[in-house]
């Protein structure tokens, strides 16, 4: 049986970056759990902001820098920065640390694997045809410059009695080539028939290494 490696983990430090750029041997467990809680708070608060990734930095034990990568930064920043100020204050009160919150705009959400996966999940939950949604996502990604894309959905598709997996592939997807820039995202759609899992791989070209 073939063994699958996580596309991001396989390329960390080469074509992919870490989502947390700190190390603390003494408080590693505490910080790791806190990072996940910080991400959960932000994503739940701004579910409509198209957040792809939250990178967390810890310059010291008292300060946390959260870099939010979003397709709709205006929702997070708010009018005259009111929303982002409120978020910073909420995080500081909850975690008892000083926070710096930065927002980076995702220019092309059509080629961001996490956002594509979440968009497909959202459309499936609204009872759209999974085949139509997948084909449209592939068309949009290729139109925006993706070299290749694969979308996989698993579960009781269209209310079928037996769960199955279906996927579509367009273009190239060299998963075994370490210099390939592969973006990977996952999401879940909760339907009345059960959970449907979505996985998205997007090939963006090769890095010069």
Swiss-Prot record:
Highest rank taxon of the organism: Bacteria
Keywords assigned: Ribonucleoprotein, Ribosomal protein, RNA-binding, rRNA-binding
CDD domains: KH-II_30S_S3
Any one Gene Ontology cellular component term annotated for this protein: cytosolic small ribosomal subunit
Ribonucleoprotein listed as a keyword: yes
Family: Belongs to the universal ribosomal protein uS3 family.
Protein name: Small ribosomal subunit protein uS3
Species of origin: Thermosipho africanus (strain TCF52B)
The encoding gene: rpsC
